[in-house]
From Swiss-Prot:
Function: One of the components of the core complex of photosystem II (PSII), required for its stability and/or assembly. PSII is a light-driven water:plastoquinone oxidoreductase that uses light energy to abstract electrons from H(2)O, generating O(2) and a proton gradient subsequently used for ATP formation. It consists of a core antenna complex that captures photons, and an electron transfer chain that converts photonic excitation into a charge separation.
Location(s), subcellular: Plastid, Chloroplast thylakoid membrane
Record-given protein name: Photosystem II reaction center protein H
Entries under SUPFAM superfamilies matching the protein: Photosystem II 10 kDa phosphoprotein PsbH (SSF161025)
Entry-linked InterPro entries: PSII_PsbH, PSII_PsbH_sf
Residue spans crossing the bilayer: 41-61
Gene3D superfamilies: Photosystem II reaction center protein H
Ranges for region Disordered: 1-21
GO biological process, one term: photosynthesis
Keyword Manganese among UniProt keywords: no
PTM info: Phosphorylation is a light-dependent reaction catalyzed by a membrane-bound kinase; phosphorylation occurs on Thr residue(s) in the N-terminus of the protein.
Modified residues (Phosphothreonine): 3, 5
Length: 73
């Protein structure tokens, strides 16, 4: 058999810590999806701006428009 399950009833549960108790409310929404589009439009705008940024960097790297008078090796 490739996988094997071990049943051990003597295994303790998760350990309680102060930090864990402080962070537990932050994890209570895990797995829930807000209805509607949510922040999708903002992500689209961010992706478009990032694409513009990459194209500007590519133009500078290729010395196509902005660096016509400067010689590069």
């Amino acid at each position: 058999m490739a996988t094997q399950t071990v049943e051990d009833s003597s295994r303790p549960g998760p350990r309680q810590t102060r930090v864990g108790n402080l962070l537990k409310p932050l994890n209570s929404e895990y797995g829930k999806v807000a209805p509607g589009w949510g922040t999708t439009p903002f992500m689209g705008v961010a992706m478009a701006l990032f694409a513009v940024f990459l194209s500007i960097i590519l133009e500078i790297y290729n010395s196509s428009v902005l660096l016509d008078g400067i010689l590069m090796n």
